[in-house]
Every structure is written in C-alpha cells, then in structure tokens.
Amino acid sequence: MSDRFEYRDIRVDGDDGPIVEGFSAQIAADGLTVIVGPSGAGKTTLLRLLNRLDDPDAGQVLFEGRDVRDYDVLELRRRVQLVGQVPVTFPGTVADNVGPEATDLLAQVGLHAALATREADRLSVGEAQRMALARSLGRHPDVLALDEPTSALDTASKGGIEQLIRQLADSSLTVVMVTHEPRHATELADHVIEVTPRS
C-alpha cells in the first residue's frame, strides 16, 4: 500500500542545536508504524510534525503527497488525531468528554457503558487512556498518532491498551506509535522507524 506520510530531510532546532537533522522516512498507510528510540532522540517531535503541533525548521512533511502546510490546520488535526502519553480529561462526565457517539466508542475501546456517566477525573489512568482514544476515534480520523501510550500504565493495563492498538491498526486506520520500548517494534509493529539521538 502507498505511504500516508513522508518525512523529507527534516531538521527541527532546539535551544541547544538540532533535535532532529537530516531525517527522512515514510509512514505506510496500512497497519501500525512504530517509531522507536531512546529518550531525547526526537521521536515525539517527529510525531507532532504530522498534524502541525510543531513545524520543521527545514525539510518537508508530506501527507498523502501534499505538504502538511498546504492543508487547513483544523482539518489536518481532525484527520490526524494525536493522543499524548498523559491522557487529557476535560470537566464533566466520560460521555461529555467523548461526544455524541460515546456508547459505541466506549464499547470499541473496551470500556463498560456504565462509565459514560462517571466524572472523567475519577477514571484510572488506564481507563482515561482508553477514553482519550475513544474521543479521538469520535473525530473519525484517518490517522491515529500515539505518543508513548502505555508509558504511564501498569503491566495489566499496558497489555489491554496494546491489544486495542493492534485491533485499531488492523482496521482501516493508519496508526503511528512513538515508544522507547524495543518490544513494541518486535511484537506489535507492522513497520518500524528507528530514531537515534544526535551525538
């Protein structure tokens, strides 16, 4: 299948020099692409370029063959949903957070319908991560970009989220996941992009 994204000779500058420099890679439209590497290698920065939460200082990011800067940024962010490693909850119930399709979406991410009326700030971290995924899926994205989605979870919760990510990747979604855990590349990924820190 064709590429969903292409990074072309990317450079992103930080306070102490480039965070990423001369980076090129493709993200396939099918399955799960895992971006793996140690802390400080620029993985999260690369993820944030996909929906313009950050822009490169040099180079291009192409989405379906077009520079991401050519898209309306709100439409780009609807199509490319980013879920951070710390799930964000808004005031109100789980249903308020997820939106009008809450019942179906909660079932899709493995949350019991009874949780819909619970205050979102009373969820466990694992439940909140699933809720954040449900909220993003409710935007009907083409791409789900996940930043270390299991890093704050206990072992039992990690397994459930990893299984859910794998199921989503087997649907029509493009799923991109940043991780520092090598086993995600070997056990979960269809495609792997390895990022190394600048020396």
Model features per residue range: what roles?
Residues N51:
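Helix-to-loop junction immediately C-terminal to a conserved catalytic motif
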Residues G59-D67, L76:
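Conserved ABC transporter NBD signature motif
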Residues A102-L115:
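Conserved ABC ATPase "signature" region
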Residues E119-L123, E127:
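Conserved ABC ATPase signature
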Residues L133:
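Hydrophobic anchor residue at the start of the ABC signature
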Residues L144-E148:
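Catalytic Walker B motif of ABC-type/P-loop ATPase nucleotide-binding domains
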Residues T179-H180:
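H-loop/switch region of ABC-family ATPase nucleotide-binding domains
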